[in-house]
Amino acid sequence: PGPAALRRGRSRATPFFPPPRAGLYRRPITTPAFPAQTEPQAVEATIGLARLAGARGWVPGTAGNFSVRIDLARAAITASGGQKGEVDESGVIVADIAANLDGPVQPRLSAEGPLHLQLYRDDPAIGAIAHAHPLSAVVLSRRHLAAGRIVFEGWEMQKAVTGVTTHEGSIELPVFANDQDTKRLGLRVSEAMKSWKRPCFGYLIAGHGIYAWGRDAFEARKHLEAYAHLLDLVLEEERRA
């Protein structure tokens, strides 16, 4: 059945996610590696990501943004405003990935949209992005801004990050200072991520929240949940120290 039939057959509270696809997220890459899909499929998967975050309490107010790539030129992305946990098709737009950074803002594109589009421009393997505001992500991003990173070491949940096969060793999540000029922020993040330790499928904006991604909506969800859990563990461990 198509996306419309799937919507009719499930409750509003049940997010839809496509099944995981074969293959791994790899760098460097010279050809597109995201799963090919239609615009309605990308819109449906975007809605699923947004509703999941809403159910977890990660998008208070009208916070958060979620997107799924359609092809090399376009991505479905939640529009500015509106409760992301209750979003439907009317709250998702199709954005031009290659839009001129110096040009006018695309209609209904949120202030955080440029960060999504910059990630898609930088890496053709990225097929979906989730931006949310888990409490631990917001608190720890401020606390660890001076260090520029949060290190996770010895946690079994590290293995939920694609490419990590053991709890031994460490992985890092970058932390960047916030900037209301999100086009400028996107370029600054882009430059820093070029040399960042892999595997890494996310970053934090200080006092704001987390961006997590993957080659499809399933993997983006997995990384969002994994990083949120790891951040909860670090916050609790620091509280007890």
Task: Label the model's feature ranges.
Residues P1-G23:
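Compositionally biased, low-complexity flexible segments
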Residues I29-A241:
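Glycine-rich flexible loops
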